[in-house]
Structure formats: structure tokens, C-alpha cells
Amino acid sequence: MQSALTPNTAAFLEYISPGHAPTSAPPAALFNNMPVPGRDTPEDTPPSVSNGSQPSAHQAPSDDSDSPTPEMPPAQPDDAANTDPLAGNGANKRKAGRPSAVLDDDDDDASDSDLPSGHEDKKQHGAGRAAAASASGSGRRGRKSGGGEGDGKRELSKSERRKEQNRAAQKAFRERREAKVKDLEDKVAELENKAYGTQIENENLRGILKRLQEENVALKQSAFTFSMPVNSRNSPNSNNGSFSAPAPQNRKPLTPPQSSNDDSLKAVDDIPMLPHRHSSANTISDNSSESLVSLRSTDRTPPALFSDHFNTYALGVVPVPPPSSSSQPTQKYPSASNGQQSISSNSNSSNVISPPSADQSEFNALWESLYPNDVENLVSQNASQNQGGPFTLLNSQPDSMSFASAGNNNSMNALFNFGAPSSPSISNSAQPSVNPAPASVTQPANHITQNLGATGQASDWNRFAFREPTAEASAPNWDLTDNSVNEFLASLSGDTTADATANDYLNNDDEAFNAQLRKIFGNDNSPSAAFNLPSTSFSPNNYLNMSPSPMMPLSNSQSPQSSDSRSNTNVSSGRGNDISMADSPEYSMGSSRTSVSHDSTDLQGKATTTTTTAIRSAKNYSCKSDNEVIHVVDEKGRVIKPSELWMRFGMQHENSTEHLLIDDLCDQMRAKATCKDGKMQLDITDAAVLFRRGERRPSQ
């Protein structure tokens, strides 16, 4: 049958359409033959041109508007069916590596393409899928759907296994992490327990160390005896290598120690021993055949941790000399002082006790030579006299342990008694008296003596702490040197009334001694203050802001005008005459702190007043010594400030201050001042006289 198309049109259609393509293909198949990347899959690619270029004898013309539909030969479907398996196999080969999801989509699209719908071109892969689906047939779709379902199950099983593996890995990680955290928590708890135990142990060790240190200090400050056998003979106590601690026992009379034949123990490193604080007797033990020189007390209380043996080290560490030889036995025997018997070393050059080597008879003879009247008589005699040595321990001086009671009962004056002689010593100064020596054992040789203000008194080194104010021997014996001291002071001052001056101060020993010094140095300071030459340069601060300093006395560098002003001031006032020495015998100065003023117009600086005047002067001196500041009072009794006084007298002008010497002015004001209500006050008129007299002085 002839075709209605022109040859050119038929050739073009053959060229663009495959030979096995059905005549009922959709129009989209003519335009979407080439694959588009991202839209068409490989299976949508049309067959090769070589396959399509073969002419088909049974090809039907394409559907045209002006041509009828050609009849389809019956063998055409068979040819298509025969050629489809090859094409399907090729498609399956190309689809082997595709995932299951793509296969499912292809199946769905292939199934949808069979529906009589005119919107196939709206699908994502419309043309290619429609051509492949129409050519493959129902068998191909069933085969493809069956393979897709198997691949989907296989892919689902892999994802499930992967999820299970992830869950298992996460679970194992959590378990490992929990185990690690638990392990760390256990270690932390263990370390905390160890730290707590270590802290407790450290606290215990600190306590032990502190206790050992206290015991060490106590042992260093206490005198103890270490006993050890001297020879190889065994004795009941020879194995005792411990310290012999003080043990209380009843008081027994002192007897000579036993012979050395029975003494098998020796005190090693024996330092001078002192009695306990409240002990009343320290005896040498004679209960056993061994004579141990140890410290024993009758105190019923246990020994204190820090006993009074600390006084042994008050002057430093006491060296322990080597033991003396047996040919020169040295002993320590008790000395009675205030009912106490102490083992002392005042008459012994050795501090180590060695057992006597002589027999009992020689030892008794030596004992009798030392104590001809027996020790008990000596103890009773001293107990009746109630006299002690010049130096006692700290425990026998409870007042001297504190400076709070320094001004009560002249305890400090008695403690450091460097004052003038007392009334009995002054009255009997012409007759030297020797105080009885304290009851301490003395030997002709190898003894240590300290004669401090006393004669024939052997002082105990261990008792060199403080003086005892209750005993007569505690005060220095001024009887031997009183006359020489008084004569020396009188010779320096040119005064022949030294004895009368001393008698005026019988009730005040310090004033008597200070009066002698004032005659020599003319001021209230120590002798070294006489050589302190203050600067004569003027400074308003010395008067405005500072009180008169006791360390700035008058010196020889003062002008004659200042001396005349002091002399005229004292003559006009009729008071303020003291007994001090100065540049001229014609003037008087009463400005010193320790000066003793007298109500007399006599310009000679000699003490010829009565005892009543001396007492009044002593009161005035005490008032002046207690008050260093002078208050200038006006007519209304109001205290004037130094700045106001300075301005009132016109001191702000420089020419008004050229004639003033601040030191002289302060001394003159102090001499004019009177004691009222415990304060030093100066009337404004007296102050004006002092200032204006200085102004008139240059014109004179």
C-alpha cells in the first residue's frame, strides 16, 4: 500500500523513530528521545540508531490528521515481544547497581503509565518510562516488581542491623563511661579517707612533739640527778639508771654523810640545786648505805613542771667543771636562811659532788670544825633572828616579781637600794659596824665571795637574784663609807653644813642625796647632764609647742645678762632661792626639777633653814617634779595659751625677741610658778615682768 507521505517526510520519520516502536506511541516520544541529565535514567535511553535504522516492512505510517489509521499487522506484537526480552535484559543489567528505592519508583511509574491518562508528560520521567512500559508488557513488570521487593528487604535488613549496631555501641560506651566514673569516685573517696587519716596522724604527732618540747624545756630548767655505779661492786640500786626525782619526806636533823666505803653511787653532771618553791627543808638522804645527793622536799604537792631551779639559769648557763680529785674532797652543806636549808655552792669552787674518801672519824672531825656549835643550834639561832642573806630568790620576793607594786612600801627602793644611808647609819657614822654574816658555811680557801655593800658576807651565786628588803643585811652598809662620801661631796661644793643638810632630810633619803648632787652640778639631772651644752639659738617652737625639757639644763654658755635677770627676779620676788651652785654666788636659780626652795632672802646658796622649811620645800619639789608644764593664768583665772601669750606681749615682731633666751625664760617662769591644785601656774603679771625685764636689759 502506497504511503500518503512524501518520500522526504517518510525518510525523516524513519530516521527519528525506532523500527520496533509501536505506532500508538505518545507524542512526547517524538521529542524526548534523548536522555536529560538529572531527569532521565539510563533505562530510558532509546535503542541504538543501528537497530532503528533497519527498515521495517510492516511499518505503519504515523498518525496524521489527514490520513487514516493504518492497519497493524498481526505479527507486530510478536516481534515486539520477541525483541523486548533482549531490551529488558539489557535494562536489568544496567539496573543491577541501582538502589531498591529507584526500582520501586520505576515500578510505580511503569504501573501508572498503563492507565488511560493523557497527563503522562507531567511525570518526572514520563516519555522514557512510558515507552519502556508499553514495550515490556505485563511479564516484565512482574519480574521487575519481584526483584525490587527482594532488594528492598535486603536494604531494610542492613539498615536495621546498622541501627542495632549503633544502639549496641552507644550502650557499651555508656557502660564504660559509668564504670570509669564509678572507679574515679571510688578513688576519690579512698584518697579522702587517707587524707583524713593522715591529718589525724599529723595532729597526734604535733601534740606529741609539743609535749616533748615542754618536757625538754622542763628538764633543762630543772636540776635532776642521774645515778650510776662508780665501781664494779653490785648494790641493790646499782642497776637503777633512771633519774632520781624529788620525793617528799619528813624533816630530819642534819647529820654528816656516811663514809665513802658505803657510798657506791655518784652524781654525774650535778648542777647547783635550789629548793622548791614552797619547800621548808632540803636534806641529805641518809636512809640507805648509798648517799645520793638529790633534791628532796617536804612539800606535799607534786613538783611543779617549771620549778624554781630556773633561777639557776637567771645569770646564764652554769658550767659544770670536772669532778675534783679524792685527795681534795669538796662538799656542799646546807646553809640556813629564813628557815630554809639549801644545798649551795657559795663556798665551793666545784659544782660536782664527789663522795668523801676519808674514813668516818676524819669526816666527823671536819664536820665539827665547820659546825662547832652543831647545825641545829645554828638553825634555831637564825630562825629566832629571822635574818637572811643579802640576796634571796625570786620566790621569796613575791612583790619583786611584779612592777605593779613598785611604789608601795618602798619595795623597789629596797630592791635597788642605791639611796642615801638610813638614820641609824647616819647617826652612828663615826662608829663603823660590821653586820653579822649570813648563816652560810665558809671555808678558808676555794670559795666564791661577792661583797656588794657588806663586809664578810659570802654571797650565794644561786641566790643572786634580788635583795631581801626585810633583812638588815639587804641594805648596803654605808657606815664605813658615809663620812668619806659626805666629806667628798662637801669638799666639792665648799659646804661645811653637809651633816646639817643630811639631818634635814632624815625622813627622805633621796632628797639628802639629791641635795648633795645639786650643790655640785647645779641641776636636777645626772652628772653627765652637766656636760650637755644646749644650743643658744632662738626657736619659738621651744616655747610655743614644747614644755621645758629636763634634759636641757643651764650651761656656762649663758650670758651675764641672763644671770643678772635671774638674780634680780629672785630678789624682787623674795622667793625661789635654792641651794644650787651657779656661775656667781650672788644669784639664785630655782628652776631645776630637784631644787629645794626656801623662804629666805639670803642670796648665799647654803642650807641653813629649819626642818619645817625643808618639809615644805620637799612638797614644793614633789609638785614641780610631777608637773613639767607651766600654765600661765590671767586675772580671771583662765589659762592662757602660749600663742595668745606670745601675741599679747608683742612677740610676733622680730625686734621684740632679740633679747630673749628661751631656756632662760622657761627657767625663770618655772622658778616663779606656784603649785596650785596639783598644777604649776604662773600669774600673767609675773610673766609680763619677766618679758619686759628682758626688754629693758639691753639699755642698762
Swiss-Prot record:
This is AP-1-like transcription factor yap1. A motif (Nuclear export signal) lies at residues 660-667. CDD domains: bZIP_YAP (cd14688). Residues 452-577 are annotated as: Transcription activation 2. Residues 127-138, 231-244, 335-358, 542-573 have a biased composition (Low complexity). Contains two cysteine rich domains (CRD), referred to as the N- and C-terminal CRD's, n-CRD and c-CRD, respectively. A nuclear export signal is embedded in the c-CRD, with which the nuclear export proteins interact only in the absence of disulfide bonds (or otherwise oxidized cysteines) within the c-CRD or between the c-CRD and the n-CRD. Depending on the oxidative stress inducing agent, yap1 can undergo two distinct conformational changes, both involving disulfide bond formation, and both masking the nuclear export signal, thus abolishing nuclear export. Residues 150-185 have a biased composition (Basic and acidic residues). Residues 156-219 form the bZIP domain. Belongs to the bZIP family. YAP subfamily. The keyword Heme does not apply. SMART domains: BRLZ. Residues 642-675 are annotated as: c-CRD. Keywords: Cytoplasm, Disulfide bond, DNA-binding, Nucleus, Oxidation, Transcription, Transcription regulation. A motif (Bipartite nuclear localization signal) lies at residues 34-41, 67-74.
